[in-house]
């Protein structure tokens, strides 16, 4: 659900064609998101949504209709929920991580669908229904245990590798800037970083390098401005937090003794909807 063709192109650039099939929908001037999505809700497995399109009315309509999907929200990391609790967030300057976070969003959604003790409302039933469909298509364990080696950092072309590292650098900067002042926003940035690090097989040494380089930048800037910089040592907690989350993801990546279906598709369908006229569709 994106407001411009340029943003659609950018998202498509970072959704590998051998793994994702984009489903482009047109949202009419007098139509809401729920009205557009409902007739084709079985055609896609995840959505990429621009944050400014998810106002309170649109969100309420989607929830009432039970239209809940694994979601990546494109926009500012603000620390609040725009769509549902399992959503992930990426700013526009970090879309090089989009494919990895779509994988992570689907994994989170599958885990939610298997959670116990949830109230049986329309939205919860929709989550369970989509989770079952995803399990049939992807295998019971989903994409969480099926990292694609062709998308590992070491397998990327040099330009892609550079762009991904720069994107991760910006995400980690967002994490540090909000770590003590806005824990909710910091957590969203942390999730994006950890998801990409896991699915791209980012070496731990690279994570430490990103942290050290940023802290060094801040140290030099504070020194030039004549400010104290001793407090920067406290940001080691952010690095420990990232490492703890990565350890948990790798722990979960060890499959339990659960039989896999005989057939499971690795090709995902992602809705990249564009609320524009049909003439402007790609």
List the predicted regions and their residue ranges.
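Non-catalytic regulatory/interaction regions at protein termini and inter-domain linkers
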Residues: 1-282
């Amino acid at each position: 659900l994106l407001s411009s063709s340029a943003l659609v192109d950018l998202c498509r650039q970072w959704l590998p064609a051998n793994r994702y099939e984009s489903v482009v929908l047109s949202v009419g001037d007098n139509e809401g998101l729920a009205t557009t999505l409902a007739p084709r809700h079985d055609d896609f497995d995840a959505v990429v949504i621009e944050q400014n399109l998810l106002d309170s009315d649109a969100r309420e309509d989607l929830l009432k209709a039970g239209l809940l999907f694994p979601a990546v929200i494109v926009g500012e990391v603000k620390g609040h929920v725009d769509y549902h609790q399992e959503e992930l967030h990426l700013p526009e300057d970090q879309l090089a991580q989009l494919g990895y976070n779509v994988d992570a969003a689907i994994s989170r959604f599958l885990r939610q669908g298997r959670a116990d003790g949830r109230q049986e409302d329309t939205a919860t039933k929709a989550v369970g229904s989509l989770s079952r469909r995803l399990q049939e298509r992807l295998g019971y364990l989903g994409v969480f245990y099926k990292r694609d080696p062709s998308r590992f950092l070491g397998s990327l072309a040099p330009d892609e590798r550079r762009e991904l590292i720069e994107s991760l650098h910006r995400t980690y900067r967002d994490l540090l800037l909000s770590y003590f002042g806005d824990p909710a926003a910091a957590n969203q940035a942390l999730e994006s970083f950890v998801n990409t690090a896991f699915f791209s097989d980012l070496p731990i040494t690279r994570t430490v390098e990103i942290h050290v380089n940023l802290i060094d930048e801040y140290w030099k800037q504070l020194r030039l401005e004549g400010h104290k910089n001793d407090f920067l040592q406290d940001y080691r907690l952010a690095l420990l937090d990232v490492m703890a989350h990565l350890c948990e993801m790798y722990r979960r990546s060890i499959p339990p003794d659960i039989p896999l279906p005989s057939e499971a598709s690795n090709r995902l369908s992602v809705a990249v909807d564009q609320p524009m006229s049909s003439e402007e569709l790609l």
